[in-house]
Amino acid sequence: MGANLTSPLPHHHRTQTTSVCNHLFSPGDGGPTFAPQRDSNTSSRSSSNAKESVLMQGWNWSKRNIQPVMSRRSLPKSGSSSEATSSKSSDSLVSFTRNVSTSTSSQYGKISISLDRNQNYKSVPRPSDTTTIIPNYYSLREEFRRGLQINTRQDLVNNNLASNDLSVIGSPKHVPRPRSVLRDDNANCDISPIAEQENVPSEASTSELLRGLGIFISNNCDVSDFDPAHLVTWLRSVDRSLLLQGWQDIAFINPANLVFIFLLVRDVLPDERHLIHTLEELHAWILSCLYVSYSYMGNEISYPLKPFLIGNDRNTFWNRCVAMVTSHSRQMLLLNSSSTFFSEVFTDLKHCSSSE
């Protein structure tokens, strides 16, 4: 009954004989091995190297298959290079890295690289050149600017040249033309010397031009009960309504805009006087001219339709406005671009106010 349970398989010499199945927990003699194919030249090796473990085969395979990354042309020619980069030596990686670093340092040795405290490359200073491809007032060279003789008192930054000089230097984009500056109410305005030679009136006010416009309408319409004071009430009421409602910040009725309204009335009213028979129709027709004037000369993008509409006939209102724009678009644009044409229209309106 005193027999011991031992495994019939061979086990390690450290294993105690009294334990059960110690061979399952003791290190074995080695993993599965395989015998690689060998050439006739390698048959003389010792039998101890005939069997190698899988781990050893994998380690030796990784060392034997190291291939150099760079070609031999880029490496420096030396007699010990073949020995240093031997694939069977354990120091092949170290020697290969040294050779690559040596060749790289020889190629980029002439480049000067500066680092800051944080080991970052310092930025290359940019060239300090003040000239640009499209020269402006700040980047023109001194000698070129001196030759142009630019007038620094003008707003040259935004190219808002409003010089009264008739030379090309004063306004390089176009030849400036004389224009009259009209001020509101009883303020006098100065006309250019060319306009004075043509005996153009040198004074204009809003009240005078309103009276002249009313007299012209009274003389060229068939409405007997129309009075020039009606025109002043119609225009002032629309202007005041838009101001109170916040549609505009400044008043629209001024001498320059009255000249624009007179241009439409002078050219359109004689042809449509046979269509206007009552004071209400004349009122609607005048407000149509005023709406077109607001669209061309107003400071805002758009305006409401209600202050300009008399009654509910919107089709007639729009047809009248479109007809005015179609037939007199050229004259309306010419009034803003040509000071001569503006002076002519202004003179006609001024004569109407003085012909009473």
Swiss-Prot record:
It is found in: Cytoplasm; Cell projection, Dendrite; Cell projection, Axon. Keywords: Cell projection, Cytoplasm. One of its GO terms (cellular component) is dendrite. Pfam families: CDK5_activator. One of its GO terms (molecular function) is cyclin-dependent protein serine/threonine kinase activator activity. Coiled coil: none annotated. Disulfide bonds: none annotated. Disruption phenotype: Accumulation of presynaptic components in the dendrite of DA motor neurons. RNAi-mediated knockdown results in an abnormal distribution of GABAergic synaptic vesicles at synaptic termini of the ventral nerve cord. RNAi-mediated knockdown in combination with exposure to pentylenetetrazole, a GABA antagonist that induces seizures, results in an increased convulsion incidence as compared to wild-type animals. Its main location: cytoplasm. Activator of the kinase cdk-5. In several motor neurons, promotes the polarized trafficking of synaptic vesicles and dense-core vesicles. In the ventral nerve cord, regulates the synaptic localization of the glutamate receptor, glr-1. In DA motor neurons, regulates axonal transport of synaptic vesicle precursors by inhibiting dynein-mediated retrograde transport. Regulates the polarized distribution of dense-core vesicles in DB motor neurons. May regulate these processes in association with cdk-5. May also play a role in GABAergic synaptic vesicle localization in the ventral nerve cord. This is Cyclin-dependent kinase 5 activator 1. The gene is cdka-1.
